[in-house]
Design a protein with these regions (language model features):
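Extreme N-terminal starter segment of soluble prokaryotic enzymes
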Residues: 1-5
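Cys-nucleophile CN-hydrolase/nitrilase-fold catalytic domain and related Cys-dependent amidase chemistry
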Residues: 15-16, 24-104, 108-110, 176-193
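CN hydrolase (nitrilase-like) catalytic-core segments centered on the catalytic cysteine
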Residues: 63-81, 153-243
Length: 290
């Protein structure tokens, strides 16, 4: 079993405070035998986006700066992968980024949120350039991992392109209320792509967050179970904590080889309209960015 620690923890009031609290949470994850520790969205500053551009820049950290390097050193020390999330320094605007660090302390990739919430505070941020998938070395062997962040979940293309790039597991830092419809989105993304999706949210009482971090394993059917099984194999409550979700990679890989979803029977030649950037009513929004 691959053990994923969902660090559903309240942020501190400072970047240094988040560094220390995050290190403590990672140590607890390791004590619980985790292979991967996943943080909520923009952990470095607790998902705080000031409306003043200069103040926002002061909150940002570099992808190769001390904040991230401390977690790289910690990953090496603990022999545990860490998916750390940051408000990343970038010009002309900061990025909402997640950096996957392997258990050897090396950065595997850096993903910056593509579907920024331009209708809200994230209009102060730049959006990312691409989706990335890479092999992550774990005690269970290599696993193909990709990342999407919070609002990315609401677009089927996010999980789909990660699946097409070979992802078996999607890591999702999150900062919003996880209610029935958003949880249903994650369930659907896992089901339709035959991928596992681990999501880590902030707990209550952080404003506009309510915990309910989850792991969906994407396996809807098993020979030994009649009908369809629940792909949600773990769901936390609203409280702060370090929660361990277990993923059966052997079962997932067998299922992906045999079932009919994912890329098995797609007809991409019929989907040309999906890359047409023309927007028509009722979907025209003045604050939309390309």
């Amino acid at each position: 079993m691959l053990k994923i620690a969902l660090l559903q923890v309240m942020p501190a009031e400072t970047i240094e405070g988040n560094l220390k609290k995050g290190i403590t949470a990672c140590r607890e994850a390791k004590a619980k035998d985790a292979d991967i520790a996943l943080f909520p969205e923009m952990w470095s500053n607790g998902y705080c986006i000031p409306s003043d551009a200069d103040a926002l820049r002061r909150f940002a950290v570099s992808a190769d700066g001390d904040f991230v390097k401390r977690y790289q050193a910690l990953a090496l020390e603990l022999d545990m992968a860490i998916a750390i999330s940051v408000l990343e320094s970038h010009e002309p605007k900061p990025l909402n980024s997640s950096i996957l660090i392997d258990r050897h302390g090396k950065q595997v990739y850096k993903y910056s949120k593509i579907h920024t919430c331009d209708f809200d505070a994230e209009r102060m941020l730049d959006s990312g350039a691409d989706f990335y998938v890479a092999d992550l070395d774990t005690r269970e062997g290599p696993i193909r991992v990709g990342t999407m962040i919070c609002y990315d979940r609401e677009f089927p293309e996010s999980a789909r392109i990660l699946m097409l790039k070979g992802a078996e597991l999607l890591l999702v830092p999150n900062a919003c209320p996880m209610e029935i419809n958003r949880l249903s989105q994650l369930r659907t993304r896992a089901f339709e792509n035959m991928v596992a999706i681990a999501t880590c949210n902030y707990p209550s009482p952080k404003p506009d967050c309510n915990g309910h971090s989850t792991l969906f394993d994407g396996v809807a059917y098993l020979q030994e179970f009649p009908g369809s099984r629940d792909t949600c194999v773990f769901e936390a409550n609203e409280e702060e904590g370090v929660f361990i979700a277990e993923l059966d990679l052997v079962m997932l890989r067998k299922y992906r080889k045999e079932e009919v979803f994912g890329n098995a029977y797609r007809k991409p030649g019929k989907y040309g309209l999906l890359i047409d950037e023309t927007i028509n009513e009722p979907f025209i929004r003045k604050d939309r960015r390309v």
